[in-house]
Amino acid sequence: DDILILERDKELGGILNQCIHNGFGLHTFKEELTGPEYAARFVQNAETLGVEIMLDTMVLAVEGHRVTACNTEDGLMMLEGKAIVLAMGCRERTRGAVAIPGDRPSGVFTAGTAQRYINIEGYMVGKRVVILGSGDIGLIMARRMTLEGAKVLACVELMPYCNGLNRNIVQCLNDYDIPLYLSHTVTNVEGLHRVEKVTVAEVGADRKPIPGTEIVFDCDTLLLSVGLIPENELTRK
């Protein structure tokens, strides 16, 4: 049967294209690859099998076995298939999703957005950084920001344990002397045009901040690595 992949980006690979660190492919290919290299292996396999690919194509709706999509070359398209596979990944939780109080200046980024700015677009997002969340993307960005010349003041985690892999704790935090604050969270963001201060406080067993435990960091950037939300809007009809 014929297979068609619809991709809204200009290239296949998704988030892997901005994950330029190594560590991919050990189980599947028995060698260590970067994210783009890992994605390229699967793209090559798909092309070898004759899979049709349409890039820069936006899917607008999925109704039964019918897909409505569009791009600049073909315009609006109505496609039908025997089976439809949704592989849309997820998006990051934002500041609003986790209700961080305080001012709303520039300098607050999700970790994945900062990663794309640095690794793909070539923009440095800040010089003095606090990271909320200790998932793997947060840990990897702590290292990446340090390698690009920024000072990572703290990695802050709400839970009493780190959510990232042990190897990332060692390679991304310990190796660069970046402090990890467990059972802490961000309680305030200050700044007029740009982030100027971030307040961090310890939390109790109820995950609520404990008065009197506040630490204020003078910084210009807050990165959020606070979880992912499935990109499933197309399934709601």
Describe the residue ranges of each PLM region.
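Residues forming the flavin
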Residues: 1-237
